[in-house]
Structures are given as structure tokens and as C-alpha cells.
Curated annotation (Swiss-Prot):
This is Taurine--pyruvate aminotransferase. Induction: Induced by taurine via TauR. It comes from Rhodobacter capsulatus (strain ATCC BAA-309 / NBRC 16581 / SB1003). Catalyzes the degradation of taurine into alanine and sulfoacetaldehyde. Pfam families: Aminotran_3. Its cofactor is pyridoxal 5'-phosphate. GO terms for cellular component: cytoplasm. The gene is tpa. Its EC number is 2.6.1.77.
């Protein structure tokens, strides 16, 4: 049994955290009378906090990131060796791991050819927005500058990224936002907006309706998550992606797929969009790229887009005038290369697909026993269970009760997630995203823990 190196006296560490650290997405008032959780070590899918408590992590680091699990010495050693050789040079020049990772990544993404490095998913998405706007000014006379985004999707935390937030609570109080960002309807059939057959095609038609309302010549790009993450783990219905792709080609609209959560194996394929046979113009990724072992994000595009920034080399405003300081840090691509190798050599895409089927089957079994589960959805190790107060009416379960289920699981030693501060009244989906290394026993323990929590909720 692994013994975590728990500090002899955790009190000073916890006190320092309480006194000086501002935690993400957290209300700190409770920490005036209770301790914040401070983690000290992880191994595989297990975590230990500063008090010595052990947890099974079904969230991959809380936000779909630690896809390889904790304590991978091979990744750490690859990063350490690269940092000794060359830790950094600005992205205006190249580095060995930057070149090698771009080549390896593009080999997984037929039809795409160029990789632009930055640090976070928010940045990666903003790079696309800037590219689209520059293309608008230089090639369309200022037209085709609008960017469409979908309800319930999330694309980052900067002001421009929040302008494309389909999650009202994430954007509230942070406006006013820049102009030129327009929402399209979501595609969650469980909470259908139309009574029809072929719901996926109807949801795609709704995008075309927005395009025609705004004017096709005004729209340059459509940004979508292949599977919506924090908005409820939404897998688009059959027929959706094929029609969306057709609509974008019909109106000469660039298709930007935000793979920050889905990318690098989370769904059982290298990228979520590859389940649907579509060809994007931009793909952005971050979390799973280096599996949390280094900060890196990528904006990947086609040679056709790349060429638009080379057409007038004598013009000092022709090229993409953007830089991301730590996009030049070599730890990111070094960790990403090793992550790619591990996924391939350890068969983690196959494991993710198989364990994802088991996780979905277990959740559907729970739904047979717990009426509070209204819908189960997901792909690979990217799953959700929406909780309801009434299955017939689909009335959402009170959000406090959803959080009580999450807390109960943590008390049992399993960390799960739930949609939160996203959609008013609909932050009711349990989110499960164990590492791609998950075993059958770990999958079963996760769902057994949820089962026990739901039984207590019913009682």
C-alpha cells in the first residue's frame, strides 16, 4: 500500500492556504470556519490530502485534465531533461520539442497542418477569434467577422471567450462584452426545444436559421464543442454533425471545434470530432495535451487558413501579429510528446472506449434503480447523469441536492463532479471523467459510490 508523504504538521500549510490563496470557482466564506482541501500527492487515480485522507479521483484533476493519472515518472523525466537542455525560447523561433510534437500531432489529424502554441484553452480559442477577425479585415473587406457559438457550450474565461459563453452564469457580471458574437440553440434532445423526428438535423437547421437572420456574408466562424462539457455532457444527436458541416461549407463559414475537454483520447478517439467524420478548419485543445504535467494549448488549422496570412509578405500587417509568452516554454511540448507516446503504447484509446462502455452501462443500471436519474449520456470516459425531481416532467433536482450527492461521494472517498454555475436552475448533471488508465474495479467503485449516495438522498 502506497504511503503518501503527509506533512508531520499540516496545520501551517492549511493556514497559509487559507490566508493567502484565492481558489478558483470558490466561495471562501466557509473557509473562515472550516479548512480548505489541500492535496499533497497523487498516484494513478488516487489522491491524498494534507490530512492523510485518500480519494479515488473520478474527475481527472477536477477539470478533465490528468488523463494519464498521477505520478507518471516517464513524463516528469522527459520534461526535466528538456528543461535542462533548453527551457524556453519565444515562439517567434522554433524548438526541438515544439517541432517534434507538431509533427506527431498533425499525424493524428488528417486535413490539418499547422500548430500554434499557447498556454490555456481560453487562449487557444481566442487565437482562432483573432485569426477570423484578421481574415475578415484583410480578405473580406471587414465582412464575415461575426462568430457563432452554441447555448450551453463554454470556451474560456477571458472576456472575448466569455462573449462566446453559452453558460449564462459563467458570463454574468463580466460584461459588457465585445460585439460580433451570436448564439445558436443547443442540441440537447433530453430538453428538446422542438417536437420532431430527426432531432439532430432540426438542431442543425436552427443554426442555419440564425445564419440567414444575421446574413451569411456577416459570419466568419462557428465555434462548437464536439461534446458539450460543463453545460451538461451533451452528445449531439444523430445527423447533427453531418448537417452542421454541410451548412458551414454552404455559407463559407469556418468550423472551429473546441476540443479542450474532448481532445487527446477523452472520448475514446484522438479527438471528439473524429467520431463523426467531419473536417474542421480549426481545432483547439489544452487539458489533455500534456495531461496536467505542463501548461500547453494548441490551435491547429489547415494550410488553406495558414496561407491567408502569407499573401502579402511586404505588408507589415499581413502576418498573424500575436504572441503568447509561455507558448515558448519547452516543458509543454516535451510533456505532450510523452503523453502521446503513452496513450499509443499503453492502448489508452481502446481502454477509454471499453471502460467508457462499462461506465455508461453502470450508470444506466443505476437509472433503473434510482428515479432521480433522468438521463444518462456520454462517450468514452466522458459521462454525465442528469438528476431530476420528477422523471415525467423532467423538473430539475434542486442544485443543493445535486451538490449533496457530490459531497456524499467525497465523504466516501470518491471525487466526482457536477455542472455548476453554468445554466441557471440546470446545474444538475453529475460529471464523471476518470483518467484514461481507469480499470474495471475503479469504474465499478465510482458507480457503487454514487449508488450509495443516491440511496441516502432518497432516504
Amino acid at each position: 500500500m502506497h504511503a503518501a508523504p503527509i506533512p508531520q504538521d499540516a496545520a501551517p500549510i492549511i493556514a497559509a492556504d487559507r490566508a493567502h490563496v484565492w481558489h478558483h470557482l470558490s466561495q471562501h466564506k466557509p473557509y473562515e470556519t472550516s479548512d480548505p482541501r489541500v492535496f499533497v500527492e497523487g498516484r494513478g487515480m488516487r489522491l491524498w490530502d494534507a490530512t492523510g485522507r485518500e480519494f479515488l479521483d473520478a474527475t481527472s484533476g477536477g477539470v478533465w485534465t490528468v488523463n494519464l493519472g498521477y505520478g507518471r515518472k516517464d513524463v516528469v523525466e522527459a520534461v526535466a531533461a528538456q528543461l535542462l537542455a533548453l527551457p524556453y525560447y519565444a515562439g517567434a523561433a522554433g524548438t526541438v520539442p515544439g517541432a517534434r510534437y507538431a509533427e506527431a500531432l498533425i499525424a493524428k489529424m488528417p486535413g490539418l497542418s499547422r500548430v500554434y502554441y499557447s498556454n490555456s484553452g481560453s487562449e487557444a480559442n481566442e487565437k482562432v477569434y483573432k485569426m477570423v477577425r484578421q481574415i475578415s479585415h484583410r480578405h473580406h473587406g471587414g465582412r464575415k467577422g461575426k462568430i457563432l457559438f452554441r447555448e450551453r457550450d463554454y470556451h474560456g474565461t477571458t472576456i472575448a471567450a466569455l462573449a462566446t459563453s453559452g453558460q449564462a452564469q459563467r458570463a454574468e457580471h463580466y460584461g459588457p462584452f465585445p460585439d460580433g458574437f451570436v448564439s445558436v440553440p443547443h442540441c440537447l434532445e433530453y430538453r428538446a426545444q422542438w417536437d420532431c423526428a430527426n432531432y439532430g438535423e432540426r438542431a442543425a437547421d436552427a443554426i442555419e436559421e440564425v445564419i440567414l437572420r444575421e446574413g451569411p456574408d456577416s459570419i466568419g466562424c462557428l465555434v462548437l464543442e464536439p461534446i458539450t462539457a460543463g453545460g451538461g455532457v451533451i452528445v449531439p444527436p444523430a445527423g447533427y454533425w453531418e448537417k452542421v458541416s454541410h451548412i458551414c461549407r454552404k455559407y463559407n463559414i469556418l468550423l472551429h471545434l473546441d476540443e479542450v475537454v474532448c481532445g487527446l483520447g477523452r472520448t475514446g478517439a484522438w479527438f471528439g470530432y473524429q467520431h463523426y467524420g467531419i473536417q474542421p478548419d480549426f481545432v483547439t485543445m489544452a487539458k489533455g495535451v500534456a495531461a496536467g504535467y505542463a501548461a500547453i494549448s494548441c490551435t491547429v488549422t489547415t494550410e488553406a487558413v495558414f496561407e491567408l496570412f502569407k499573401d502579402a509578405p511586404s505588408d507589415p500587417l499581413c502576418h498573424f501579429r500575436d504572441i503568447s509568452t509561455f507558448g515558448g516554454c519547452t516543458a509543454g511540448p516535451a510533456a505532450a510528446l510523452e503523453t502521446l507516446r503513452i496513450i499509443e503504447e499503453e492502448g489508452l484509446l481502446q481502454n477509454t472506449a471499453q471502460m467508457g462502455e462499462r461506465l455508461l452501462a453502470n450508470l444506466r443500471d443505476l437509472a433503473e434503480r434510482h428515479a432521480v436519474i433522468g438521463d444518462v449520456r456520454g462517450k468514452g470516459l466522458f459521462c454525465g447523469a442528469e438528476l431530476v425531481a420528477d422523471r415525467r416532467t423532467k423538473e430539475p433536482l434542486a442544485e443543493a441536492k445535486v451538490q449533496a450527492v457530490v459531497a456524499d461521494c467525497a465523504a466516501q472517498g470518491v471525487l466526482i463532479g457536477a455542472t455548476n454555475r453554468s445554466i441557471p436552475g440546470l446545474n444538475t448533471t453529475l460529471c464523471l471523467a476518470p483518467a484514461l488508465i481507469a480499470s474495471e474495479a475503479e469504474i465499478d467503485r465510482i458507480t457503487e459510490t454514487i449508488d450509495a449516495a443516491l440511496r441516502r438522498l432518497a432516504a
